[in-house]
């Protein structure tokens, strides 16, 4: 009798382990199915994902090739991933066996330590995200959102929920989170990790009307992104979560 009970307990444990292991994949399949059926409303098209729109500043160059003025609604200029690397290779940061720019290393360490290992969604953080978003009614970009999810939210902002009732607000936040996950998966499919990191740094606001890492580096330190040291890069990444206005 005792042997049967032991086998029964082991069987239940194995079953529970399988349920835990397969639940994320079942959730992903459900999300994609509901998205295909239009339950989450309009999703960004592949064309929009391949050519995201942002307000860029118009830069005026002098004969010497230097910027002499800008016109903008948002002070934003794009920079490529390769242009984030310091000219001195000794200033490069080694992360996971790869050289990365200091500002990208600071971003990963601060926002998404498993950035290079997931496909847009950090499965171990799903439960924390669920508790924070649904139970605590906290819609901030922290609490487990990956860099790719935050990029999805920056490129395709959520609808406001301030004037909704509690139930309606909760349902809208859940719907927005599902859309954010699906968009993150699509971004990971369309872009490399390096491109995603650069896009994120180019789209976020750093305060003082500085949008994008190029404008932020110039505004706060009078430098280009490749001239930032580790401390300056860490400060700019930290400012993203609490920018000055």
Role assignments for model-derived ranges:
Residues 1-63, 68, 134:
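N-terminal type II signal-anchor transmembrane helix
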Residues 61-245:
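Peptidoglycan glycan-strand catalytic modules in the bacterial/periplasmic cell-wall system
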